[in-house]
């Protein structure tokens, strides 16, 4: 909304910016993942991200002027900052939380639920602020970064030796070859194919606020209503994060992935078929069903079928990084489609792509019954290196 209504960019230009953000995130995510796997439970990388979050206010206050001056330079700078801070940084935080949940013995979804509640509160307030002064949101972002840094400094973690015993080998013993060995595993590429389809939801979400706001008599009313809708969605998502672990444990990680992908396809295709703000809102709210199941299932699937020491690398490369690649390629095409054909036909094409990858994934993803035995996750020889299976 801010890029379109306040900076004055067209959908194609907005797609260029999102493409740059995704490209930078693509480069940062594998690096972040491997670094965090090496760090284990140490918070060094999270502290760096916290400092970048604090700088979000000053950055965005000058970002609009840079974009109006030169869209290409602005896209590069925006890609560097947003890609490294938010798009790549959120994956580090989520994988860190999931790693702690495995060690401490609680469900990841119950911790992630609080992130959804925070997002819901932020979007509710931002929906009001953007009609008053969008800069208020940027100041709030920096304040939130300060709070995150304080909480991170107060967070107590396990001793490294306890972590090493639980993870069947020291994270510091990981090498680049351990991470690269993933590329030789057919099951890794099957996971990549699934993610290629499901990450289309991020491209769908990028300019959905513009589409939704256009359904109302005035853009101001549309902005405010979108803030309410987004807040409701994320509050429902938080509830879904609490319930999703029970469902995924019942149906299995693979079936959970396929269910989330099916809901996603229905949501995107439905957005292209229905008319009016009420029905479009219903399609948007399906995200609250889809995302909790997807996140819980992807972490459970990774822990069942891959070396657990590489959990951050798997999530940031196998999920976040692939999402960035697809977003880099599809964001400009989606922007072109919105400008020349409209939102509805473009959504139909996106939804059909998700249907195709879902059907292929139903065949290629490994069943829970083929999960690796605990002792096969790593080779506990003197070198303590993970072996491809």
Residue ranges and their predicted role:
Residues 27-41, 130, 240-253, 338-339:
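Helix-to-loop junctions at the C-terminal end of transmembrane segments
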Residues 137-154, 345-364:
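Symmetry-related core transmembrane helices of the 12-TM Major Facilitator Superfamily/SLC fold
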Residues 86-102, 293-307:
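Intracellular juxtamembrane helix-capping segments at the cytosolic ends
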Residues 1-6, 80-81, 183-204, 285-289, ...:
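Pair of pore-lining "gating" transmembrane helices in MFS-fold secondary transporters
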Residues 156-192, 217-218, 381-388:
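Juxtamembrane intracellular "pre-TM" segments in multi-pass secondary transporters
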Residues 51-69, 263-275:
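C-terminal ends and interior cores of transmembrane alpha-helices
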Residues 1-13, 206-226:
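Short amphipathic helix-loop junctions that connect adjacent transmembrane helices
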Residues 309-340:
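A late C-terminal transmembrane helix in Major Facilitator Superfamily
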